[in-house]
Amino acid sequence: HYVFLCCPESDLQGRMQQPFNLETWIESHPQYRQYFERLPRHPQEYWRPFYNVTCSSWSKGRVCIVGDAAHGMAPNLGQGAGVAIVNAVVLSRILAKERDVPAALRKWEASERPYVDKTQRMSYLYGAVGTRWPRSILDVRSKLLPLLSRADIWQRSLRVALDHKPAV
């Protein structure tokens, strides 16, 4: 099982919970009590920060990297694995048609990189809204997020990976 619960990096109490402190999370989010109480416990629970992995290039010569090695992102949007799978499928399609491997890899990255980069940026932004928002204006976030969630431009931005249709 995998559960992703985030807290600000500055929240030492949230980060250092080993094991997971159920009561702290229920106190912070009482509306989710029923879900927190159903979480299975595991003796190896731990907190780790997430990092975006951004490479200047996904390939060199006849070698490439895919998935988290090329563009790791925090699971804020739940898109990392899907993006990696789509990248691999597109890569296989291009390699099946193109004999020049370095050229195929360049074509693949040119095709996939724009939507991957945008997905990564939106994942970071979504996480930052949740964990880096200034405490002094949390009430603003609480009013802003419901409005944003109804805006088409926000929804399209969050769905960039879901809506991606590979050209290859």
Predicted regions and their residues:
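Short, structured helix-loop boundary elements
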Residues: 19, 102-105, 137
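C-terminal auxiliary extensions adjacent to catalytic cores
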Residues: 142-168
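Conserved FAD/dinucleotide-binding core of flavoprotein oxidoreductases
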Residues: 1-47
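Alpha-helical structural elements of signaling/regulatory helical domains
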Residues: 31, 97-100, 114, 132-136, ...
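Conserved mid-domain beta->alpha element of the FAD-binding
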Residues: 44-125
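Crotonase-superfamily enoyl-CoA hydratase/isomerase domain that binds
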Residues: 121-138
